[in-house]
Each structure stands twice: as C-alpha cells, then as structure tokens.
C-alpha cells in the first residue's frame, strides 16, 4: 500500500499535519477550500522564481474570522520581500483584494533547499527543460540530497526520455526510503517538465528519519552531517520500467 499512495497524505494525522488549518461550519467549507486554492495559486504565480516549498493557511481564532495568517516557506525570501518590503506589500494587497479579508503574511526561509522534495523536483524539471540528460539530472539531485543530510532519496522520471518514440519510466535510489513505515518522515513531490518532446513526469521521495514517540516531524528535519557520503561500499540503485531485471518503476 505504501508503494501506491501519496506518502504525504498517508501520514496526515500521524506524523504530519494539514497545511490549511481552520474550524468552520459545514456550509462554509466549500468556499474556504476554493479560497485556499486561489490563495496558493496567486502566490505561486506572483513569485514563480522564489522557490516556494510550502504555503500554510490558518484561520484559528473565531474572534478574527476576517483575518487570515499565511506562512510562505521559501528558499529565496528576498524575492518575495523585495526592497524595503515593497514586493511583499504588493502581494498582501493582491491577497486582500482576492479574499476581502485582513491578511497577515509571514515569509519563512528554507535553510537547506537540497533536502526539500518539491524544490528538488522543480530544479530537476528546470534542468530537463534546458535539455540536460535525464540520468545526469537524477544523479546530481540524489548526490546533493545525500550530501545535505538526507538518509534516503528516490527519484523517478516518466515520459519520452531522451526523445524516444515510446514512453518509459526510469529511476534511481540511494539509501533507505521505507514507504510502508508510517513513522518514517518521507517528503514527497510530483511535478511536470514541459520539453520539446512532450511532458515528463518527475517524482521525488526524501527520507529524513523516523519520528519516535515524544518527537515531532521537526526533529527529523534538523540539519545533520551526512554519514552515507563517506561510505565507499554504498552503491546507488537503478530501476527501469518494462525491464524484468529491475524493479518495475510503475509500481513504485
């Protein structure tokens, strides 16, 4: 089951929490879900090159129903803040116009972007669109993540790889990625790369460690030194779709 499902959704309520947090009446739920979708779409379109990894939306206090707290996690906070906060103020104005509510915008810096699955996948997509060879793209991403301290990394690219007539899937993995272990902190992302040969699908799994009793997901994502990069006996694993000698990538 862990091989089929989205690792982020599978761990919600166990070791992960929701990115939208609010308590309202049943009649208000559809409108707020749509509003959250439009808020995230506006922020991502407004700051496309700011490497946004996560957007948290909170409406927790009943006394402040007309107030929304938005936390943007980004590897490039200066792009969103701008000179003297001008860019941030423009974004807040657009959000107020969209929601017709008071908006409190927090910009949080992602200290190590090489261990964030979404940022890694976006970086891989950008390189593929610039016609870099797909195997090199995967190996570079895995090496950076392991060097940054990830305990396990797995990548998968699907589509017309290298301009081939028949689409296939090919992936690489290094370290442990225990998808069936619910206490395992696994960061997952899936993005698309639009190339001249068509659309390529990119999936990335990052294993940060196990969340033990009394710990939170923040404990496993602290910066730690990579011990695996100094192990000469470790060999990366490769797998290709449609080849009986390897793991079937489509089932992963």
From Swiss-Prot:
- Superkingdom of the organism of origin: Bacteria
What InterPro entries does the entry give?
A: KH_dom (IPR004087), KH_dom-like_a/b (IPR015946), KH_dom_type_2 (IPR004044), KH_sf_prok-type (IPR009019), Ribosomal_S3_C_sf (IPR036419), Ribosomal_uS3_bac-typ (IPR005704), Ribosomal_uS3_C (IPR001351), Ribosomal_uS3_CS (IPR018280)
Q: Name one GO biological process term.
A: translation
Instruction: Please report the stretch or stretches of sequence annotated as the KH type-2 domain.
Output: 39-111
For this chain, the family text in UniProt reads: Belongs to the universal ribosomal protein uS3 family.
Pfam families, per database record: KH_2, Ribosomal_S3_C
Q: What is the annotated role of this protein in its UniProt record?
A: Binds the lower part of the 30S subunit head. Binds mRNA in the 70S ribosome, positioning it for translation.
- This chain's source organism reads Aster yellows witches'-broom phytoplasma (strain AYWB)
On assembly, the entry states: Part of the 30S ribosomal subunit. Forms a tight complex with proteins S10 and S14.
Q: Which keywords does this chain's UniProt record carry?
A: Ribonucleoprotein, Ribosomal protein, RNA-binding, rRNA-binding
Q: What is the name of the protein in this document?
A: Small ribosomal subunit protein uS3
What positions belong to coiled-coil segments? none
The UniProt GO MF terms for this protein read: mRNA binding; rRNA binding; structural constituent of ribosome
SS bond list:
none
Provide a GO CC annotation, any one: cytosolic small ribosomal subunit
Q: Where is this region: Disordered?
A: 226-252
């Amino acid at each position: 089951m862990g091989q089929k499902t989205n690792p982020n959704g599978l761990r919600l309520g166990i070791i992960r929490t929701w990115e939208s947090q609010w308590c309202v009446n049943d009649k208000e739920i559809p409108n707020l879900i749509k509003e959250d979708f439009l808020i995230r779409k506006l922020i991502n379109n407004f700051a496309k090159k700011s490497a946004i990894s996560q957007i948290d939306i909170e409406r927790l206090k009943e006394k402040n129903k007309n107030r929304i707290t938005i936390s943007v996690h980004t590897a490039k906070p200066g792009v969103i803040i701008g000179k003297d906060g001008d860019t941030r103020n423009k974004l807040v104005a657009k959000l107020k116009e969209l929601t017709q509510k008071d908006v409190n915008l927090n910009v949080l810096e992602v200290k190590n972007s090489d261990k964030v699955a979404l940022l890694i996948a976006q970086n891989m997509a950008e390189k593929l669109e610039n016609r870099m060879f797909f195997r090199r793209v995967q190996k570079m991403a895995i090496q950076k993540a392991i060097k940054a301290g990830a305990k396990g990394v797995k990548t998968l690219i699907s589509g017309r790889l290298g301009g081939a007539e028949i689409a296939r899937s090919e992936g690489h993995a290094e370290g442990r990625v225990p998808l069936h272990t619910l206490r395992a902190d696994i960061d997952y992302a899936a993005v698309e790369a639009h190339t001249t040969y068509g659309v390529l699908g990119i999936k990335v799994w990052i294993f940060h460690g196990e969340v033990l009793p009394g710990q939170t997901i923040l404990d496993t994502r602290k910066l730690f030194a990579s011990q695996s990069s100094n192990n000469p006996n470790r060999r990366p694993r490769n797998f290709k779709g449609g080849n009986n000698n390897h793991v079937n990538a489509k089932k992963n």
